[in-house]
């Protein structure tokens, strides 16, 4: 069997065997101030994202507008909930939660990640070896 083909197959198997779950910043449901040091590994079927949660004004609050407290925090989001709005009631307060997703490790922060997943690195090395047979 061709050594290049063996390399490609090994890289593919390595990527599948290791798997890759996304690592994300998480605040445990709290506001995003100083939570960027908390890194969690999302479960299967989850991606990094942000939750924007704000209470809906009651009829009394609508008559007297005031500042509305809105929470924006990073979290793992189920893929099927990405870019959706959910309405939930807690006691007599109704909240609207917007769930937005992003792609890649630690993408739900302003700080870019410098960590390259092993399977991408292996694929890049294999591709270079395949394109440059003299290596």
From Swiss-Prot:
Disulfide-bonded cysteines: 24-48, 27-35, 42-76, 82-101, 102-107
UniProt-annotated location(s): Cell membrane; Cell projection, Filopodium
Domain of life where this protein originates: Eukaryota
Any one biological process term the GO annotation gives: acetylcholine receptor signaling pathway
Glycosylation sites noted in the Swiss-Prot or TrEMBL record: 68
One GO CC term, this protein: external side of plasma membrane
SUPFAM superfamilies associated with the record: Snake toxin-like
Membrane topology recorded in Swiss-Prot or TrEMBL: Lipid-anchor; GPI-anchor
Expressed in which tissues: Expressed in embryonic tissue and adult lung, kidney, brain, liver and spleen.
Record domain UPAR/Ly6: where: 22-121
Lipid-modified residues, GPI-anchor amidated asparagine kind: 108
Main location: membrane
Post-translational events: O-glycosylated.
GO function term, MF aspect, one: identical protein binding
Extent of the signal sequence: 1-19
Pfam families in the record: UPAR_LY6 (PF00021)
Keywords: Cell membrane, Cell projection, Disulfide bond, Glycoprotein, GPI-anchor, Lipoprotein, Membrane, Signal
Protein's UniProt name: Lymphocyte antigen 6 complex locus protein G6d
The species this protein was found in: Mus musculus
Designated gene of the protein: Ly6g6d
């Amino acid at each position: 069997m061709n050594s290049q083909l063996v390399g490609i197959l090994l890289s593919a198997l390595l990527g599948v065997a290791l798997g890759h779950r996304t690592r994300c910043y998480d605040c445990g449901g709290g506001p995003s101030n100083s939570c960027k040091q908390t890194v969690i590994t999302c479960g299967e079927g989850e991606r990094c994202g942000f939750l924007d949660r704000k209470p809906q004004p009651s009829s009394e609050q609508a008559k007297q507008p005031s500042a509305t407290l809105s929470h924006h925090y990073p979290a793992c989001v189920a893929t099927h909930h990405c870019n959706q709005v959910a309405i939930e009631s807690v006691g007599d307060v109704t909240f609207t939660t917007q769930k937005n997703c992003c792609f890649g490790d630690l993408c739900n922060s302003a700080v870019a990640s410098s960590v390259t997943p092993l399977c991408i690195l292996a694929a890049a090395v294999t591709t270079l070896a395949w394109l440059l047979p003299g290596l």
